[in-house]
């Protein structure tokens, strides 16, 4: 790759990383790409929500399930897993919780 293209790409990644905050950049880019390719359905996301020490993850499981209707389960004492059709706006809304350290996971084409 040319030096100019690499510089542009590095700048792009830096800007996206700043905009996404706690959201893993690869996850965010996957979701946004799928949103643009498949206009009629949100991507299927397997979201790993990593909480800070001391957070009651059982209550977080309930609140995420109640608010969004996702399949949600506690994974360990600091992690909650959520699966459902999500767009980047939903992920950014979830990331607003000050008790979250980071959001990771994967996204794929939704199935009906």
Set out the residue ranges of the language-model regions.
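Autoinhibitory N-terminal propeptides
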Residues: 1-112
């Amino acid at each position: 790759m040319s030096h100019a293209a690499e510089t542009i790409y590095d700048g792009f990644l830096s800007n996206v990383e700043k905009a996404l905050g706690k959201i893993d950049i690869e996850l965010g880019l996957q979701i946004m790409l799928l949103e643009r390719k498949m206009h009629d359905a949100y991507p299927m996301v397997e979201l790993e929500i990593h909480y800070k020490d001391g957070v009651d993850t059982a209550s977080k499981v309930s609140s995420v399930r109640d608010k969004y209707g996702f399949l949600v389960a506690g994974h360990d004492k600091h992690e909650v897993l959520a699966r459902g059709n999500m767009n980047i706006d939903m992920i950014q809304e979830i990331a607003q919780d000050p008790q979250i350290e980071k959001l990771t996971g994967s996204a794929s084409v939704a199935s009906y």
